Amino acid sequence: APDDYYDLVFVVVQAGQLPDVLPVLKANKSQYFVFVGNNPQAKQVLEFMQRPADKIAFGFQGTAGRREHDHVVSVYASAGMTVGGATTPLSGTFRTRLKTAFDGAKYKLTFYGDMDEWLKCHIAFVLPACYVCYACNGDLHRATKQQRGAILDAAYEACLMLKDAGIPVNDANNTDNFQPGTSARRKMEAMVFTMTKTPLGRLCVSDHAMHAVSEMKYLDEAFDALRRQTGTAMPMWEKLRNEMPSWDSLQQNRKAAK
């Protein structure tokens, strides 16, 4: 209800579901909101909420898992969240409020100054991995060496596209890791190999991709809109997209599996 007041409001829904809940959140008199999850449009959400930039945060929790019939299987190295403002650091007041909320919970908060950039760069890697997952019918063990390399090549292209779109990409944490021929790229190749050959890949990529087709489609459409604006050449990205089944068929298969 609009008159309900909370010290912190955590919004944990898929980005494509936000249009249904944003009007309700905007009408609420609470001041501090944290939108958690993959979101390619943090700046637009901030604008819609019509609140000061230091009252709206965006976060990403580094966990994974899947639903079984009667329970949830989850995996995490350590519980925590990367969190910050859409394009500016959170105020000291907001940081203190977040730290107080998780005090004693063994939950690590990593503050970041530009979460719109962070989230877009995260999606730049997530989507190519999902494209390959769909091409392999959810079984990343089937991914070839060429496909594993293509994930990183496509992520590199996506980072260049984001820079063309005016996004201040943190190259050290993103572009440099994907650039062919570098030591950082070789480390990423080892990580992707592990991701495709161990149960960790199923939990971190396959389960999410296969159970959240609508979310991935939404992210894909958001990135495609950006790509059309920039005109950046992304041949490997396009190749991976063309090798996966259509979004309609993936959604139909998902409905049939329920």
What are these regions (language model features)?
Residues A1-V73:
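Rossmann-like NAD(P)(H) cofactor-binding subdomain of soluble oxidoreductases
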Residues Q41-H122:
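Rossmann-fold dinucleotide-binding core
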Residues V72-G85, Y134-K145, P199-M210:
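Helix-loop-beta segment of a Rossmann-like dinucleotide-binding subdomain
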Residues S91, Q147, I151, A212, ...:
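Aromatic-acidic/polar surface patches that form glycan- and anion
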Residues R97, A101, G149-D164, Y218:
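A non-catalytic, amphipathic alpha-helix used as a structural packing/dimerization or gating element
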Residues T110, L140-K145, L226-A233:
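Inter-helical turn/loop segments and adjacent helix faces that build the functional surface
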Residues D116-C159:
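Active-site-proximal catalytic alpha-helix in oxidoreductases
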Residues Y156, K163-K258:
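NAD(P)-dependent Rossmann-like dehydrogenase/reductase catalytic/cofactor-binding core
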